[in-house]
């Protein structure tokens, strides 16, 4: 690589013989088996896969498709960057692609309701397949009626009508503050090139925007990497570890040059809140 810890005299000897000195070796946190499985599972779909180790922040797998062959990027450059090429293979969809979070955002809608209401377990709503406020209606998938549910059951069913009604119960300003704490509208704690996710809901936006946002639609945009970080924090008792992909650097003879250690970013939620969400996600 760009630097080497080969002994000085060895380097001089290599120079005199017209040979290149071996560089250091970088060992990543990527798990080959997981990386290969994620790559194959994504197939020909456009999308991304991110796998993290919650307790350390190690990035175990990261896939973005469509992809490209780095060995032939010079020859392929013109086709990769052509105006009529809609694949955007040079975009790392895992860290740079911004998408509506959809039902994954119900994690945060749930967390906000729990934080605002100590009696959250008592909330129930009878789903008839849709929820209407004024001229605006939110439908469940296939207009399915889920019946009477509590929060835990509605989370498991991913009931849009329930969550639209739940959203109307929230303090929008506090919801925005929660999303700020969850790193929306901010740089993620990573050295990777990553886009900022956005949460822009305001009280003045009205019921239609509030309902849509509560089910992960509306104007909210997020990267797959960001959502993986949030789920990782939930699985680590509310604590987010800084994600990293470099495990260590070794010299050409295998001597350890530098070891990268896990580092805590901060607490995103209480241990109790994380336990509730883990329970809901496993229901």
Specify the residue positions occupied by each region the protein language model found.
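Structured loops at beta-to-helix junctions and adjacent beta-edge loops in soluble globular domains
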Residues: 1, 29-31, 218, 280
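Small/polar-residue-rich segments within soluble enzyme cores
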Residues: 1-23, 40
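Beta-lactam-recognizing serine transpeptidase/beta-lactamase-like catalytic domain environment
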Residues: 13-15, 55-103, 108-283
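Bateman/CBS regulatory modules and CBS-like beta-alpha motifs in cytosolic regions of diverse proteins
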Residues: 20-34
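Small/polar loops that bind or transfer phosphate-bearing groups
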Residues: 30, 51-52, 167
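Short N-terminal helix-loop-first-beta-strand/juxtamembrane motif that initiates sensory/input modules
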Residues: 44-53
């Amino acid at each position: 690589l760009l630097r080497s810890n080969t002994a000085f005299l060895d380097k001089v000897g290599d120079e005199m013989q017209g040979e290149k000195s071996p560089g250091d070796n970088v060992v990543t946190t990527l798990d080959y088996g997981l990386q290969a499985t994620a790559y194959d599972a994504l197939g020909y779909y456009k999308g991304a896969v991110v796998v993290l180790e919650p307790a350390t922040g190690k990035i175990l797998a990261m896939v973005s498709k469509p992809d490209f062959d780095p060995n032939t990027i010079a020859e392929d450059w013109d086709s990769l960057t052509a105006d009529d090429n809609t694949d955007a293979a040079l975009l790392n969809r895992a860290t740079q692609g911004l998408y509506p979070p959809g039902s994954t955002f119900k994690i945060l809608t749930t967390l906000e309701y729990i934080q605002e209401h100590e009696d959250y377990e008592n909330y129930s709503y009878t789903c008839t397949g849709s929820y209407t406020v004024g001229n605006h209606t939110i439908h469940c998938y296939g207009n399915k009626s889920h019946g009477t549910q509590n929060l835990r059951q509605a989370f498991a069913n991913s009931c849009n009508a329930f969550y639209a009604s739940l959203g109307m119960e929230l303090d929008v300003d506090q919801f925005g503050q929660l999303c700020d704490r969850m790193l929306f509208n901010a740089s993620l704690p990573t050295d990777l090139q990553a886009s900022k996710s956005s949460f822009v809901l305001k009280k003045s936006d009205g019921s239609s925007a509030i309902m849509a946002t509560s089910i992960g639609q509306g104007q909210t945009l997020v990267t797959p990497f960001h959502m993986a970080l949030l789920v990782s924090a939930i699985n680590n008792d509310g604590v987010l570890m800084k994600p990293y992909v470099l495990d260590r650097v070794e010299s050409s003879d295998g001597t350890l040059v530098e070891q990268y250690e896990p580092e805590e970013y901060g607490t995103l939620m209480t241990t109790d809140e994380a336990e509730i969400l883990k329970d809901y996600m496993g229901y």
